[in-house]
């Protein structure tokens, strides 16, 4: 445990990029700041629910930013999460969202679930001269629900 704590703040081991397990502490920092300044301060987007297709992103958004509408996981071709029980997918049909993905490109498997998707921003986090995380943020319109 001591080694992990030291590695988190004073990298001693020659680990770079995604091979460093302590990057998890840092990888969402840019995303949180970018969402706060770009999405939550934009009047046209601030009323939209933030969604993702993996549970970690909404959990991080809810913890650090506490949006008006709770960020949720849609669980499309993904295991059910706590959000699946709190938010009935049928009640979300027709809604527009801010969608966050953990890669730069919009995921192909998600495209059929929305009428359109527009890029809002790309958030990149580097540590020790290596990119450790890329997140893309999208405006998605007219959620079709589970297909």
Language model regions located:
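Transmembrane alpha-helical segments
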Residues: 1-26
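A broad, low-specificity signal for short, low-complexity segments enriched in glycine/proline
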Residues: 9-12, 56-64, 99-102
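A near-ubiquitous, low-amplitude feature marking generic local secondary-structure context
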Residues: 14, 18, 44, 51, ...
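Generic signal for short, ordered secondary-structure residues
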Residues: 14, 39-41, 119
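Short periplasmic/luminal acceptor-recognition loop of GT-C membrane glycosyltransferases, typified by
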Residues: 21-81
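Aromatic/acidic, Gly/Pro-rich catalytic loop(s) in extracytoplasmic/lumenal soluble domains
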Residues: 80-147
